[in-house]
């Protein structure tokens, strides 16, 4: 074997010396290899990763390169999101032409346009349609060599020619850019979702808000992101970041349970978590467009009619409406929690637009107002980083009513132009139909032609187009990294995993279920037990229908017997026999009309209700104008004879604020489930039979039960705020033979204190920004009281201060109305230090917890009583002035005369006394100064007064001396 190895070294000398050397190396090769491996193991870890793959190209750089290659028509097309009718996109379809010939940037799929088919083919058909749409764009880009944009003098690629351009379909695009394929799927099925079957039935946003758990919100977002991106969607409209500060069903903002809640901080926290889930669940293949910017939670009317108005000041808008949008843009804590774009709503805002008139445009068409909003720091930094603005549906009735109130002339191209120049980058055309066009397709084509013409004629307009297209391309590169059909169209194998995450929805249903009325203590009295076998139960259900498409069969949003069937499945004769199927009967709200005033009567229904022990009412939303809602109100007010001596339980499968106080007073129990999918119906059944307890808390104010969210989210006055030393974050660990010792605080060091998590009335962390007042006291002969303020972050506030001298230091905290905290005592002495936690006297069960060494000290009386000079402060002032007076007298007698020495001393002491008197009698400004400066501040004021007195004496001497010289 060794000979064969040696023969491989054909050019080596064959002398015995070389032969022996090679034999020796071969013999010792295992030892040499072992030594090399051992040496390599000591190399730094960084060297192992030195040959990592080349990092991905920056999306902005890729977008700039693509923009330079695009024709004007391709650029203009990227601005438009279009809709179309039907569930296919063959070569004869209008959407095929819009993609192939006019290069539109994206499409939006909607149930109203029959883009989806009925179950069981809903998912497979949607996947095929999206794949078909992306392939139209891809095949068109491959049919010709790549084009290069005609460079303009400004270098943007804008053609220099300004000649009139004939509007015709252009040659197929030579640059492949994946389409945006968008959808709005906020949860809870119809009417807001677009896909009703085949996907996991996700909850409404308010159900997430009622859990007060951002982690659950992120999980739901991840499910939505994974399933929608698996179908091929890459543009998501949502989540809604509207703040329902004072929800009023009488006005109706149209949001129902499609908002997280009414607290700006929590809406932002839940929204940020949801966006994080969308990004991570889709592997960053979803471009997330948060809605409905700048917020329509306080709108005076629902969308769909004339433009709504939000009458709030600018400051109020920044604190309430805009706060959640700050948290997902410039103030976002993570890239995953940052929205890629904002959907600009067609609403007017007094805080940005001044007095609102009928001619005041919605903010989506008001360049001055929108620019003012986007100039706010959080939005400005986000826009600089590539954030997109997307117009809401330009074909909505709201837009048409504003532009054409008389119904005579509606020019879509001008609407699109105004929205674009107002600051929107991406224009959602919707089903817009211009008065000079036959249909939506012709309207979009004419609008594209109008934009192309302006691009050629107007350099400023062309530059504005290029800016928006660069944002759009950057967003698409962030989504895909590289433009190829393999990444734009997901694998069909992923469809098998869709709709398998119902466990997440059930967990949300379990944690969000809320007892609205009465409270838990009263519930056990009013409803001590669950239904039993002999009880008769009548279910009254608000049944409405939905269609996946115009030719699809109708199906109920909430089946009339949905709750009855779940109860039989869980508690019927097959599983313990807690109830009898013969004792359960279900009716619709419509059936109640027969037994109301003016109805024909229904003896059978009346008889069933009279015999019932339980009446369980399942209601959906109750916006004004809903006939079902009127029926329920009439039933509760007119037929109390049928409800007397019965257990009346209401389950609200939407928002909780639709019943008034009078209606609620007639109920035994009122629960809110927020969503109507199967997991929520099951939780309702388990609540009725007391198998589960409601764990959720109302995320909005409910006037019907006197629940005010602002009060509920303030600190709970019954809690004791904990305090602890806040240690600096440990540095990144490195291999070390001996750990470093913990630093010991000493005089002059900075000491940090943090609170425990401060809880609100519902037991959740208080919103960020809650003010906490700290009192820092240094005990001693010249003790100090210092007032410090901090705001919470995730329920915790912290302060840092310098240790002025050795002694006993105490720290307390309060956050109105929570006024009690433990006392943190820091004892610093020459021999060491100790930190002791002392429980407040009002909470005897707490015991002091000491760390390190603890030496009890006698605490002298404070020199400042409640922030003002006390006896200790007076003695300190007198001592100081005696010393100062003595020094001044000695200097005067040595350098001047005894007479002037006495005058200097008296003026110095008088100045100090006057300054002390100013503080002691609490003249204007004294209180605030002492609270900030404490005892040292008082000494400073006395010294200043003494200095002014001495200065007056010197001036007096100079005047007298000068007068004597002149007389002489």
Regions picked out by a protein language model, each given a short descriptive name:
Residues 51-197, 201, 518, 612, ...:
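N-terminal hydrophobic targeting/anchoring segments and the immediately downstream early-domain regions
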Residues 42-54:
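Sec-dependent signal peptide cleavage junction
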Residues 33-44:
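Bacterial N-terminal signal peptides
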Residues 51-103, 196, 384, 403-772, ...:
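Preference for extracellular/luminal or secreted protein segments
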Residues 71, 91, 119-128, 132, ...:
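Second-shell residues forming the walls of enzyme active-site clefts
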Residues 98-123, 328-363, 610-625, 917-924:
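Short acidic, glycine-rich surface-loop motifs adjacent to enzyme active sites
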Residues 117-189, 209-232, 236, 265, ...:
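Active-site-adjacent structural elements in enzyme catalytic domains
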Residues 77-84, 105-109, 179-187, 235-239, ...:
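Hydrophobic faces of well-ordered beta-strands that scaffold small-molecule active sites
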């Amino acid at each position: 074997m060794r000979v064969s190895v040696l023969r491989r070294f054909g050019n080596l000398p064959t002398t015995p010396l070389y032969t022996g050397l090679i034999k020796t190396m071969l013999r010792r090769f295992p030892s040499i290899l072992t030594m090399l491996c051992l040496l390599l193991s000591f190399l730094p870890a960084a060297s192992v990763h030195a040959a990592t793959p080349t990092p991905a190209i920056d999306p902005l750089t890729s977008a700039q390169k693509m923009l330079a290659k695009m024709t004007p028509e391709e650029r203009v097309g990227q601005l438009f999101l279009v809709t179309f009718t039907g569930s296919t996109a063959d070569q004869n379809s209008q959407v095929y032409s819009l993609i192939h010939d006019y290069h539109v940037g994206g499409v939006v799929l909607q149930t109203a346009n029959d883009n989806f088919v009925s179950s069981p083919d809903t998912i497979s058909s949607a996947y095929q349609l999206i794949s078909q749409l992306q392939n139209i764009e891809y095949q068109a880009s491959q049919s010709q060599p790549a084009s290069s944009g005609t460079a303009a003098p400004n270098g943007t690629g804008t053609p220099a020619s300004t000649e009139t351009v004939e509007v015709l379909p252009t040659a197929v695009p030579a640059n492949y850019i994946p389409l945006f394929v968008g959808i709005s799927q906020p949860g809870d099925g119809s009417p807001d979702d677009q896909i009703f079957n085949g996907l996991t039935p996700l909850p409404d946003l308010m159900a997430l808000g009622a859990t007060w758990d951002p982690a659950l919100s992120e999980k739901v977002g991840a499910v939505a992101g994974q399933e929608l991106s698996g179908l091929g969607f890459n543009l998501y409209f949502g989540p809604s970041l509207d703040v329902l500060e004072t929800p009023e069903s009488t006005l109706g903002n149209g949001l129902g349970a499609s908002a997280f809640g009414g607290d700006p901080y929590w809406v932002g926290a839940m929204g940020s978590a949801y966006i994080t889930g969308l990004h991570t669940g889709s592997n960053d293949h979803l471009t997330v467009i948060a809605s409905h910017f700048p917020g329509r939670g306080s709108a005076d009317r629902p969308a769909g009619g004339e433009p709504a108005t939000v009458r709030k000041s600018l400051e109020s808008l920044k604190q309430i409406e805009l706060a959640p949008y700050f948290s997902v843009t410039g103030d976002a804590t993570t890239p995953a929690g940052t929205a890629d774009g904002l959907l600009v709503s067609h609403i007017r805002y007094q805080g940005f637009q001044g007095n609102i008139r009928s001619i005041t445009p919605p903010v989506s068409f008001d360049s001055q107002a929108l620019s003012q909003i986007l100039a706010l720091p959080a939005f400005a930094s986000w826009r600089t980083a590539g954030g997109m603005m997307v117009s809401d549906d330009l074909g909505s009735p709201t837009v048409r009513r504003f532009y054409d109130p008389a119904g005579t002339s509606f020019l879509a191209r001008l609407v699109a132009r105004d929205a674009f120049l107002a600051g929107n980058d991406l224009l959602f055309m919707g089903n817009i139909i211009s008065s000079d066009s036959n249909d939506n397709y012709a309207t979009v084509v004419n609008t594209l032609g109008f934009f192309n013409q302006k691009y050629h004629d107007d350099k400023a307009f062309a530059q504005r187009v290029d800016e928006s297209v660069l944002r759009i391309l950057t967003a698409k590169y962030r989504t895909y990294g590289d433009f190829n059909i393999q990444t734009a169209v997901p694998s069909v194998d992923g469809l098998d995993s869709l709709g398998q995450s119902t466990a997440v929805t059930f967990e949300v249903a379990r944690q969000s279920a809320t007892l609205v009325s009465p409270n838990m203590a009263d519930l056990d009295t009013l409803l001590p037990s669950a239904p039993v076998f002999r009880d008769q139960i009548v279910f009254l259900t608000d049944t409405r229908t939905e269609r996946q498409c115009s030719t699809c069969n109708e199906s109920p949003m909430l089946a009339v017997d949905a709750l009855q069937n779940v109860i039989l499945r869980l508690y019927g004769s097959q599983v313990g026999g807690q109830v009898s199927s013969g004792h359960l009967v279900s009716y619709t709200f419509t059936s109640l009309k027969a037994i109301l005033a003016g109805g024909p009567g229904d003896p059978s229904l009346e008889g069933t209700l009279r015999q019932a022990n339980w009446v369980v009412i399942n209601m959906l939303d109750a916006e004004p104008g809903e006939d079902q809602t009127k029926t329920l109100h009439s039933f509760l007010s007119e037929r109390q004879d049928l409800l007397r001596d019965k257990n009346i339980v209401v389950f609200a499968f939407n928002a909780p604020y639709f019943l008034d106080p009078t209606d609620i007073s007639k109920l035994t129990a009122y629960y809110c489930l927020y969503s109507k999918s199967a997991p929520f119906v099951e939780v309702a059944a388990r609540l009725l039979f007391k198998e589960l307890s409601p764990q959720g808390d109302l995320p909005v104010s409910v006037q019907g039960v006197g629940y005010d969210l602002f009060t509920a989210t303030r600190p709970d006055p019954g809690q004791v705020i904990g305090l602890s030393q806040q240690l600096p974050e440990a540095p990144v660990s490195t291999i070390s033979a001996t750990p470093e010792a913990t630093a010991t605080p000493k005089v002059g060091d900075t000491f940090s204190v943090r609170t425990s998590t401060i809880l609100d009335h519902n037991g959740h962390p208080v919103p960020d920004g809650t003010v906490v007042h700290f009192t820092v006291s240094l005990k001693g002969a010249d003790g100090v009281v210092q007032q410090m303020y901090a705001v919470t972050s995730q329920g915790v506030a912290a302060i840092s201060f310098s240790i002025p001298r050795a002694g006993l230091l105490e720290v307390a905290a309060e956050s109105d109305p929570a006024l009690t905290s433990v006392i943190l005592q820091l004892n610093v002495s020459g021999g060491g230090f100790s930190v002791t936690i002392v429980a407040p006297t009002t909470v005897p069960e707490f015991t002091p917890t000491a760390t390190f060494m603890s030496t009890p000290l006698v605490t002298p009386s404070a020199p400042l009583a409640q922030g003002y000079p006390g006896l200790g402060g007076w003695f300190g002032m007198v001592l100081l002035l005696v010393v100062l007076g003595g020094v001044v007298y000695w200097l005067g007698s040595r350098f001047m005369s005894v007479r002037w020495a006495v005058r200097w001393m008296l003026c110095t002491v008088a100045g100090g006394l006057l300054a002390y008197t100013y503080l002691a009698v609490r003249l204007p400004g004294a209180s605030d100064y002492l609270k900030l400066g404490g005892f040292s501040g008082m000494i400073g004021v006395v010294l200043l007064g003494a200095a002014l007195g001495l200065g007056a004496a010197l001036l007096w001497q100079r005047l007298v001396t000068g007068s004597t010289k002149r007389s002489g």
